[in-house]
Amino acid sequence: MAGHSKWANIKHRKAAQDAQRGKIFTKLIRELVTAAKLGGGDVNANPRLRTAVDKALSSNMTRDTINRAIERGVGGGDDTNMETKIYEGYGPGGTAVMVECLSDNANRTISQVRPSFTKCGGNLGTEGSVGYLFSKKGLILITSGDEDVIMEAAIEAGADDVQVQEDGSFEVYTAWEELGAVRDGIESAGIKIDNAEVTMIPSTTVELDAETAPKLLKLIDMLEDCDDVQNVYHNGEISDEIAAML
């Protein structure tokens, strides 16, 4: 799990900026619709939908908008015919990049994703080319709290690992299938959770210098600007000193 915290803050800061500009709303609605279509409209019985709802609420989406998206998904129709597709490739500095897309037109999606890699000095790879470097995990972020209390609650709830960050925050890792159960267990202990999501954690990382780091972030920006792209994962490691300059 090395390297995750080095770029997690940049990712989350960017997500907040995107939400302020309204860029992320279309993607959130698309995920809500798809999650409801595949698993039903009950958040208590549909972990993917609950995660999508939590993410939408944290981005200040209204309950009315969320409920309408869920109703669209449950009701079906042509506009809900979305499929998840993962593209793999190499970014600046030899970084491994995985792009999670949700689309009803694979040709349109690849025509957006491939040029982003090319323009940033990377290249789109074949299926499996970098996927083996990542593990699908549940990740729970807790900004602050008593370390002993959080550790005990997380372990009791079934977490795989808890890491204390330099800023005093906590990253709780779970099997991705157990994310909802672990989240519920931690919350039942009275602990405030700031974010919970299924993500891809790199097993090895590539340290980026001051010249390469901005190029990787540019690639991420270009990919996230694509309407069909939901998430971008990478194994680039950016030091605190370089991150402070970005």
UniProtKB/Swiss-Prot annotation:
Record has S-adenosyl-L-methionine as a keyword: no
InterPro entries: Integrase-like_N, TACO1_YebC-like_2nd/3rd_dom, TACO1_YebC_N, Transcrip_reg_TACO1-like, Transcrip_reg_TACO1-like_dom3, YebC-like
Keywords attached to this entry: Cytoplasm, DNA-binding, Transcription, Transcription regulation
Localization: Cytoplasm
One GO location term (cellular component): cytosol
Any one Gene Ontology BP term: regulation of DNA-templated transcription
GO MF term set: DNA binding
Pfam families, per database record: TACO1_YebC_N, Transcrip_reg
Main location: cytoplasm
Record flagged with keyword Protease: no
Family affiliation: Belongs to the TACO1 family.
UniProt name for this protein: Probable transcriptional regulatory protein PM0980
Organism: Pasteurella multocida (strain Pm70)
